[in-house]
Structures are given as C-alpha cells and as structure tokens.
C-alpha cells in the first residue's frame, strides 16, 4: 500500500479515495498526501492516444462500397474536473489498450455512419467536410466518457471496384482536354500577341516616322519663326532709328516753340505791365474822382431818399389823422342825420300824409330848379313858333311851368299821395 506524499507526472492524474472525501480527490500532474489507513491512491493516464480507424467496404449513399482509413488523436481530459471524474468512473483500473479499444470502436462506428450518409464524390472531393462531421459527432459521444478528440483526419480512401479510378480517369481526361484547349489557346494567344507585337512595332515605326516628320516640321516652323523674328527685329531697329530721329526733330521743334512761347510770354508780360501802368494812371486821373463823385451822389441820393421817406411818412400820418377826423365828423353827421331821420320818421308816423305832403312841398322847389338848371347853362336860345299861342319868353316859361305842373301827378303815381287834395283839405 502506498501512503505519505505521492507524486505523478504531467501525463497522468492521481485519484485519492477513502475517508475524509465525499468524492475522489483528483490531482492531475501534481502531488497528494495519502493516509496509510482508510485511503488509497490510483493513477489514470493522460497520454494522447493515436488511433487508426479502419472502415473497410462501407456502402455510401449511392451504394458504392469504399474503404476509409482515418487517424484520430484522443486523450483523457485532465483540465476539466467533471470530464476527468467521468473518465475515472469509466476507465479507472483499465489499461491504455483497453481505453484505446473503446475509443477506436466508438470512432469507427461514427465514421461508418458518416460514410453511409455521403456520396463517394463528396467524400473524395470534400475530405475536410467529411473529417469535420466525424470529428463533431464522435467528440460529443466520447465526451460523455471523459475522452477528448484532439484531431481527426482521413489517411486513405480506396475502393475495390475501380470507382475512384474511373473518377480519376474522367478527371484525367478533363485535365488532358483542358490541357489541349489551354495549349491551343496559348498558341492562339501567342499568335495574337505576335500580331499585336508586330502591329505595335509598325505603329511604333509609323509613330517614329511621324515624330521625325513632326520634328522636321517644327524645326522648319521654328526656323521660319526665327527668320521672321530676325527680320522683325531689324525692321523694328530701323523704325526705332527713324522714330528716334523724328522724336529728336520733334523735340528740337518743341524747344524752338518753347523759346517762342517764352518770348511771347515776356511780350505779354510787358504788355500786361503797360496795361497795369495805364490802369493805375487812369485810376489816378479818372476812376478815383469818378468814384468820389459817385460816392457823393450816392450819399445825396440816400439823403434825398431819407427826406422823401420822412416826408411821405409825415404826409401819411397827416392823411391818417385827417381821415380819422373826417371819419369822426362823418360819423357825427351821420349820427345827427340818423337822429333827425328818426324824428322825421316819428313825425311821419304821427302825421302820415300831412308830413309826406310837407316833405314833397319842400322838395318841389328843388325839382323845379333842377328842371330849369339846363336852361341856365344855355348861352343862346332860338325860339321857333307857328304863330298860334304864346311866343318868345312866354312860350319858354309856359313849357317850364307845364313840366312843373306834371310833378304832383307824377308823385301821385309813384307814392299814391294827392298833393292838390291834401293842400285843399288842409
């Protein structure tokens, strides 16, 4: 019996069971203390096991028998305590060969099942898919035993009927066909490329010739442009010389004109000085006395204007005062006449027709005087008579009296007052 401190390498695990533990103590790649009484220690391998999974003559989904050899790497999982405990329950006390056999049988069963669900072409062309399906299905099943599938791959694929060989021959024929087609296409492409190269060579040659011709043309054009520029420069130089000569002549003429202008300016200055002298002389002899006389006359006119204004203002004031006096007199007279008229109106209301008769009698002499007034202005009167009635002054007097006698009737027609009746009644 082993007791005390017990150790193990990283490729195995210690399983301590007995007293003091409700479940076994699992120590992967470490050490543990084991009591001599009531406890025991066991070991389980954690080595990776390589399995060669043979599946001979398995019928695929198409009914074609093929044989597959797969290589799987499996081991007891020591990092997961639950899986390690499961592995201890399943394999503790068993040898690696026994564990290998259990895992191999399980993998072979899953491999055969996957082969039966796929076609030969699928397994042959997509080995990765086949390996993945076997790996996934077997991993979940072996995990329940505490074993992990590290890897799985197909080592060999074969058949006894020559099916795979036929597929290979067909593929070989396709490859040969594709090779011949590729060779023909390559030759055609080579011919095409040769033609393109020749075309490019000719195009390059033509382009080169064109460039040479263009360069020659550019040279000729530039040479002609240079010749034109040289001729232009020569012409410009000649024109510049002529222009400079013309400018020189023009400048000489301008200077001559400037001299004439200066001389004329001096003459004008002399004339202006003479004019100023004469103006000063004129101002001393005529203008100043005239201005003095003008000032005197302006002052006299201003005095007369002031006098006239004052006289006009005095006259206006006199007229205003006289007008006010006359207005007062007229107002007083009008007031007296109004009072007299009021008294007459009162008398007229009292005496009525007698007052009217009295007023008319007072007016009749004035009417007779106005009737005879034109006669008083006559310087000479010539009387013509037919011989009947009055003649001479008597005739004229009778005419006047006849007019006067018509006045009472006229008054009666106008006012309705009978003067003759009123006088007799009075």
From Swiss-Prot:
It is a peripheral membrane protein. Keywords: Cell membrane, Developmental protein, Membrane. It is found in: Cell membrane; Membrane, Caveola. GO terms for cellular component: cytoplasm; cytoplasmic vesicle; flotillin complex; plasma membrane. This is Flotillin-1. Transmembrane segments: none annotated. Expressed in brain and ventral nerve cord from stage 12-16 of embryogenesis. InterPro entries: Band_7, Band_7/SPFH_dom_sf, Flotillin_C, Flotillin_fam. One of its GO terms (molecular function) is protease binding. GO terms for biological process: positive regulation of cell junction assembly; positive regulation of cell-cell adhesion mediated by cadherin; positive regulation of endocytosis; protein localization to plasma membrane; regulation of receptor internalization. The keyword Glycosyltransferase does not apply. Belongs to the band 7/mec-2 family. Flotillin subfamily. Its main location: membrane. May act as a scaffolding protein within caveolar membranes, functionally participating in formation of caveolae or caveolae-like vesicles. Pfam families: Band_7, Flot. Gene3D superfamilies: Band 7 domain. Heterooligomeric complex of flotillins 1 and 2 and caveolins 1 and 2.
């Amino acid at each position: 019996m082993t007791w005390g401190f017990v150790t193990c390498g990283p490729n195995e695990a210690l399983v301590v069971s007995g007293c003091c533990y409700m479940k076994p103590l699992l120590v992967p790649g470490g050490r543990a203390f084991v009591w001599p009484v009531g406890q025991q220690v066991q070991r389980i391998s954690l080595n990776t096991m390589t399995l060669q999974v043979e599946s001979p003559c398995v019928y695929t989904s198409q009914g074609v028998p093929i044989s597959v050899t797969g290589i799987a790497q499996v081991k007891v999982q020591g990092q997961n305590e639950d899986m390690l405990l499961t592995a201890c329950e399943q394999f503790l006390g068993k040898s690696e060969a026994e564990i290998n056999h259990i895992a191999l049988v399980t993998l072979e069963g899953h491999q055969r099942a996957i082969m039966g669900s796929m076609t030969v072409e699928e397994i042959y062309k997509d080995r990765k898919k086949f390996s993945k399906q076997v790996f996934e299905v077997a991993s979940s099943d072996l995990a329940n035993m505490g074993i992990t599938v590290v890897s799985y791959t197909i080592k060999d694929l074969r058949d006894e009927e020559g099916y795979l060989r036929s597929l290979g021959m067909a593929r070989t024929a396709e490859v040969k066909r594709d090779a011949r087609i590729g060779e023909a296409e390559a030759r055609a492409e080579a011919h095409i490329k040769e033609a393109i190269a020749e075309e490019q060579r000719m195009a390059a040659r033509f382009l080169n010739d064109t460039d040479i011709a263009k360069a020659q043309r550019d040279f000729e054009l530039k040479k002609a442009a240079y010749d034109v520029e040289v001729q232009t420069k020569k012409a410009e130089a000649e024109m510049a010389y002529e222009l400079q000569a013309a400018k020189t002549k023009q400048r000489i003429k301008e200077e001559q004109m400037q001299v004439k202008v200066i001389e004329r300016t001096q003459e004008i200055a002399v004339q202006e000085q003479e004019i100023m002298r004469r103006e000063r002389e004129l101002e001393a002899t005529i203008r100043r006395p005239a201005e003095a006389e003008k000032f005197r006359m302006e002052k006299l006119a201003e005095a007369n204007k002031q006098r006239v204004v004052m006289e006009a203002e005095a006259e206006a004031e006199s007229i205003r005062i006289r007008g006010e006096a006359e207005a007062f007199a007229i107002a007083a007279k009008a007031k007296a006449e109004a009072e007299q008229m009021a008294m007459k109106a009162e008398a007229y209301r009292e005496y009525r027709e007698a007052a009217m008769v009295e007023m008319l009698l007072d007016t009749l002499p004035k009417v007779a005087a106005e009737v005879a007034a034109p006669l008083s202005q006559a310087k000479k009167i010539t009387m013509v008579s037919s011989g009947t009635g009055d003649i001479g002054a008597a005739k004229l007097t009778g005419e006047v009296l006849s007019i006067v006698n018509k006045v009472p009737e006229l008054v009666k027609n106008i006012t309705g007052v009978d003067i003759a009746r009123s006088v007799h009644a009075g």
